[in-house]
């Protein structure tokens, strides 16, 4: 099961299927890592070979930063070093039955990478897209077969490059994190928790997952001078806001101090709401 736990093994699985990946491998000592940095060029990305999401991920821009990383890293952890990919993160997600048939699939689009959000103390948003790109579904379907995904949720991450091509990032045989399960529900007026229970108990899946709405998480941080108050946002778009909450401090660097979950049937309306929440003076 290494290929569902270790990023280095995932990379090999992606290549077996014929999907492009970022150049990289597990590193040894400082000199080994420095040699790869010279081969790929700065910046590079270093992250635990075994881990979830962006936890303990570092963007390294120089030899000095590389030296600092080796000074503070966990000595008992294996790390993988990769070339830095400049692209937008998109996902191929969903659920399969016991025979590996796709019961529904979905895609998320992230406005910026987690590293950029933390580095710049920036706001972020990501949304459930109503429209599934054909190339994403084609690649995702191949991965489901390669990883033999049966009766479970899946969450495959990719970079969408400026030229439109895809580079595989990570495979997770679980639902996406955060509020994504709830966002799928709000995007469909569905109850996936009950639907999954029905699937496990009876083998049937009756949820209607046609995505009549876009659904988006939008963050706010207390340090930014927003043009519109929360009250003004709610007065104009309260009917589109399905959740507003104060985030626990442990999640604030990524998810913001406050989070809105919004939905809209049309893309432009979604972008208009995001703009009103996010625009600063």
Each language-model region and where it sits:
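Short secondary-structure junctions
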Residues: 18-19, 147-149, 236-239
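ATP-dependent carboxylate-activation loops
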Residues: 174-195
């Amino acid at each position: 099961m290494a290929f569902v736990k270790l990023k280095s093994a995932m990379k090999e699985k992606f290549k077996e299927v014929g999907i492009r990946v970022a150049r990289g491998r597990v590193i040894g000592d400082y000199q080994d890592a420095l040699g790869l940095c010279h081969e790929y060029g700065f910046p590079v990305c270093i992250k635990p070979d075994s881990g979830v999401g962006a936890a303990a991920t570092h963007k390294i821009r120089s030899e000095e930063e590389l030296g600092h990383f080796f000074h503070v890293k966990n000595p008992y952890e294996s790390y993988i070093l990769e070339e830095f990919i400049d692209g937008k993160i998109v996902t191929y997600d969903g659920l399969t039955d016991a025979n590996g048939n796709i019961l529904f699939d979905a895609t998320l689009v992230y406005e910026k990478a987690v590293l950029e959000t933390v580095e710049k103390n920036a706001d972020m948003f990501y949304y459930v897209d109503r429209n599934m790109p054909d190339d994403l579904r084609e690649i995702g379907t191949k991965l489901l077969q390669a990883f033999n995904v049966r009766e479970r949720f899946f969450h495959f991450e990719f970079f969408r490059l400026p030229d439109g091509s895809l580079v595989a990032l990570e495979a997770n045989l679980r639902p996406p994190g955060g509020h994504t399960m709830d966002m799928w529900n709000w995007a469909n007026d569905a109850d996936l928790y009950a639907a999954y229970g029905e699937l496990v108990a009876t083998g049937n899946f009756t949820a209607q997952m046609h995505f009549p709405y876009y659904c988006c998480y939008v963050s706010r941080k207390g340090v930014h001078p927003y043009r519109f108050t929360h009250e003004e946002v709610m007065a104009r778009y309260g009917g589109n806001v399905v959740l507003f909450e104060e985030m626990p401090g442990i999640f604030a660097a990524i998810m913001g101090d406050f989070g809105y979950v919004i939905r809209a049937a049309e893309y432009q309306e979604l972008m208009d709401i995001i703009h009103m929440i996010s625009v600063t003076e």
